[in-house]
Amino acid sequence: AGCIAPGKTGHSRGKLDVRAVRGPLTLKELRKRFNVSPVPFGDPALLMSQMYVLPANQAIHEYGLIPHWIDAGLAVIERMKTLGVKIIDIRQPTQSLILELASVKKVLSSSLHGLILSDALGLPNARVRLSSNVIGGDFKFSDYCLSVGREHSSTPLDDKSTISKLNQIKFNDHIRWDADLILSSAPWNHE
């Protein structure tokens, strides 16, 4: 749905049938290399809101942390566990993931799709940086934030972070996007 970094479109040549993109930065990159017309913005993972609803009154943890897979083995993960933060692996089966997300009040994530899924399900969330290992840096996060009208910010966490630091993080709890616009751009609506 989007470029990972400037100049990284995932395609080197050929014709692309682009119906929607993650955000304006991706569209700009695609327009540099391909003859791509303006299309709607929105990551398809936001459509999870059309398929799943979080079970009500299940939150038993103040915070959940969704680390990017590349951050999964870091010492900061163990530190977060000692602070009572629920560690959530986004790679698990969808139904299990939804139940784990229902068990938290707020989501911290170094994974873009952790933020997107949290937004789709209406969970307050914030981007955290656990390392500099996530490919693409801020690009894909900025692209997404621009597409849903939210401020892009991130908070670095490490193995010395405290609950006080977590309590000071500003969480995003509202985005602007149009599911119908994304759905109407799907190929089956244009055959």
What are these regions (language model features)?
Residues A1-E191:
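Active-site anion-handling motifs in enzyme catalytic cores
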